[in-house]
Amino acid sequence: MALEERHRIRSPSDPPDTAAGVRPLRLASASGAPFYDVVALLASAGGLSALGAILAGLPEDFPGAIVVVQHLEPRHRSFIADILSRRTKLRVKEAQDGDRLQPHTVHIAPPDYHLLVNPDGTLSLSHSELVHFVRPSGDLLFESVAASFKDRAIAVVLTGTGSDGAMGVQAIKKMGGTVIAQDEGSSEFFGMPGAAIKTRTVDFILPIDEIAGALVTLFKGEAA
């Protein structure tokens, strides 16, 4: 799959040789190792369907670890891991403090806890204060992923109200990572993707049915 230029959003910070709209091709290593380590997904209102569409489109051998923040009602038990596990061949689990990131695995933030990724690949849960009125916070997840994995991280902002994720995508971009936002046409609510796009750090704006394929392509190093 090739990511079409019409989806590429050029940042003012891009080097001059990307004026055509696509950054230079970065090739996978000779060993065939994936070009990225982790994908961080953020969703809010309308997000369950969007997350399901992405995970359903990823192959069983997708090499990356996936971490997810979905804004949830904090006072009730979450069944999101059970629901999403029926949509994908990947392993899906609710994250626990001290878990270690695993390839082919989706780690979902539990209700009312921030999910953080540490440099050693372990996960931490925090009940610290709300960030922009939400817990778990996509901003905190993205910032921790950026600090831990730098240019080997991809952040994806999906449907949702508000502006969670807008600060975090800037951290991802600052450390050399890649940012994807769901397009307006396929978003049930465009608040969060729109806020991310306004930061001018988004690399690709894609309809929901193209995001899984884009992730596979990026991990292969075929386009970035």
Task: Label the predicted regions.
Residues 1-224:
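Strand-loop microenvironment adjacent to phosphate/nucleotide-handling motifs in alpha/beta enzyme folds
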